[in-house]
């Protein structure tokens, strides 16, 4: 069974720009998939539709049995609990430290503080930021900010990890 099935998806913006037209894709559990294309070819639009920031004009997007296109706004959290998302523009919370930015992803799921501390420190060590826990996003390089975003995306062990240019700002660890 497919983890993701996208069928005949179309998205046209109000400006008339066609981002996706009759797009189809199936991804099975365990597959590692890259979507590549020129700037403006619809890659980021596709990603936004996968985590339901945007809806397609036509077609269906099924993720783990959930019809994303028909999901009511008040139920979007059900989908997002299963996803880890690495955004190309970071979306870090500027008034929170590195630790707090990553911990936030667990706090919304009501983990206890001990679980949060243990897991956040494991993940920050994994991405090479264990020594930056008290710093704020504006005190980090672009590559370090990107690693915080990656840590936040994986801290909850998501069933699906969606990345929009995840290595764009990374330096070697």
Which residue ranges define each predicted feature?
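Conserved ABC ATPase signature
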Residues: 135-140, 144-146
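Short coil-to-helix segment of the ABC ATPase nucleotide-binding domain corresponding to the Q-loop/switch region
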Residues: 96-104
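Hydrophobic anchor residue at the start of the ABC signature
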Residues: 150
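Catalytic Walker B motif of ABC-type/P-loop ATPase nucleotide-binding domains
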Residues: 161-164
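A short, proline-enriched helix->beta-strand linker immediately N-terminal to the Walker B motif
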Residues: 155-159
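Helix-to-loop junction immediately C-terminal to a conserved catalytic motif
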Residues: 51
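Conserved ABC transporter NBD signature motif
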Residues: 59-67
């Amino acid at each position: 069974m497919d983890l993701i099935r996208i069928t005949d998806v179309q998205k046209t913006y109000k400006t008339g720009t066609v981002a996706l037209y009759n797009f189809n894709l199936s991804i099975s559990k365990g597959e590692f998939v890259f979507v590549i294309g020129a700037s403006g070819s619809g890659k980021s639009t596709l990603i936004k539709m996968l985590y339901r920031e945007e809806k397609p004009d036509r077609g269906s997007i099924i993720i783990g049995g959930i019809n994303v296109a028909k999901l009511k706004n008040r139920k979007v959290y059900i989908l997002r609990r299963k996803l880890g998302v690495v955004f190309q523009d970071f979306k870090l919370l500027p008034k929170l430290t590195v630790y707090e930015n990553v911990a936030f992803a667990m706090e919304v799921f009501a983990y206890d503080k001990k679980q949060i501390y243990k897991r956040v420190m494991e993940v920050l060590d994994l991405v090479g930021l264990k020594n930056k826990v008290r710093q704020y996003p504006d005190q980090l390089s672009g590559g370090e900010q990107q690693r915080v975003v990656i840590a936040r995306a994986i801290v909850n062990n998501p069933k699906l990890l969606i990345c929009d240019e995840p290595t764009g700002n990374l330096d070697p660890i």
